[in-house]
């Protein structure tokens, strides 16, 4: 398969066409941003970790019946994915209060939620990806009722599957962001699953193993990313 022209470059990835219809070529970058692009930097080998970790987790989710856009891992930084018509919503699943939820509700970071919370955010960098609900999404035509139901149900199912793996790896899944799209009328999980899109805490020490280390200038960012990948790979090696 041949890599074609670059379609667009995002904050963390470059997406290219291929010579096969319906398939994109994705390259993961080391660039890092936070606070809607206000903070910028580089995390060494982030692209490698995010590419390989996403591939591992997409493969596991596929085996449980969750459709993803993942097709094939090409090398350290690149993969082939299915072309999707993206739903312009982020689905955020939270198991523990942290980040914007803790701030918005005035609760301490680290509070265990009695059940997973599912939130929707409208994908728009200029607006800061605002928190929205189903009524907004339907009224604005961002998604159909059936798709809203499906992506939230998939979010909870993905949460359960990821928690099984991460628990064995000694990692707490605090919260995470998902993006979905459609191809031929079917909903697929898109984007990535990585320390860029998830909050991971060490189960014993509660040490942060994700992009919060970059956001908050905690140091050892590269080491945290690599450690997550190492642990997950070890759990899934069989």
UniProtKB/Swiss-Prot annotation:
Q: Which GO terms describe its biological process?
A: 'de novo' IMP biosynthetic process; cobalamin biosynthetic process
Keyword Nucleotide-binding: yes or no? yes
Q: What is catalysed by this protein?
A: 5-amino-1-(5-phospho-D-ribosyl)imidazole-4-carboxylate + L-aspartate + ATP = (2S)-2-[5-amino-1-(5-phospho-beta-D-ribosyl)imidazole-4-carboxamido]succinate + ADP + phosphate + 2 H(+)
The pathway this protein participates in, as annotated, is: Purine metabolism; IMP biosynthesis via de novo pathway; 5-amino-1-(5-phospho-D-ribosyl)imidazole-4-carboxamide from 5-amino-1-(5-phospho-D-ribosyl)imidazole-4-carboxylate: step 1/2
Q: What is its EC number?
A: 6.3.2.6
Task: Name the Gene Ontology molecular function terms of this record.
Answer: ATP binding; phosphoribosylaminoimidazolesuccinocarboxamide synthase activity
Q: PROSITE patterns given for it? A: SAICAR_SYNTHETASE_1 (PS01057), SAICAR_SYNTHETASE_2 (PS01058)
Q: Which Pfam families match?
A: SAICAR_synt (PF01259)
Q: Which InterPro entries match?
A: SAICAR_synt/ADE2_N (IPR028923), SAICAR_synt_PurC (IPR033934), SAICAR_synth (IPR001636), SAICAR_synthetase (IPR050089), SAICAR_synthetase_CS (IPR018236)
Tell me which UniProt keywords the record has, alphabetically: ATP-binding, Ligase, Nucleotide-binding, Purine biosynthesis
Keyword set includes Ligase: yes
Which EC class is this protein assigned? Answer: ligase
The family annotation for this protein states:
Belongs to the SAICAR synthetase family.
Give the protein name, as stated in the record.
Phosphoribosylaminoimidazole-succinocarboxamide synthase
Q: In which organism is this protein found?
A: Desulfitobacterium hafniense (strain DSM 10664 / DCB-2)
- Gene behind the chain: purC
């Amino acid at each position: 398969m041949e890599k074609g022209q670059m379609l667009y470059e995002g904050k963390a990835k470059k997406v290219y066409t291929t010579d096969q219809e319906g398939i994109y070529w994705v390259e993961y970058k080391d660039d890092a941003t936070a606070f809607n692009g206000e903070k910028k930097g580089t995390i060494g080998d982030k692209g490698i970790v995010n590419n390989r970790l996403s591939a591992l987790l997409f493969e596991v989710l596929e085996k449980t019946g969750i459709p993803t856009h993942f097709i094939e891992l090409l090398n350290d930084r690149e993969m082939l994915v299915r072309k999707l018509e993206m739903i312009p919503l982020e689905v955020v699943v939270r198991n523990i209060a942290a980040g914007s939820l803790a701030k918005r509700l005035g609760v301490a970071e680290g509070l265990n939620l009695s059940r997973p919370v599912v939130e929707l955010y409208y994908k728009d960098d200029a607006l800061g990806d605002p928190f929205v609900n189903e009524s907004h999404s339907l009224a604005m035509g961002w998604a159909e009722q059936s798709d809203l139901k499906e992506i939230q149900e998939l979010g909870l199912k993905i949460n359960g599957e990821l928690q099984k793996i991460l628990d064995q790896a000694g990692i707490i899944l605090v919260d995470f962001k998902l993006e979905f799209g459609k191809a031929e009328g079917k909903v697929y999980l898109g984007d990535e699953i990585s320390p860029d899109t998830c909050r991971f805490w060490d189960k014993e020490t509660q040490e942060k193993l994700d992009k919060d280390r970059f956001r908050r200038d905690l140091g050892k960012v590269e080491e945290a990313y690599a450690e997550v990948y190492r642990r997950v790979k070890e759990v899934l090696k069989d």
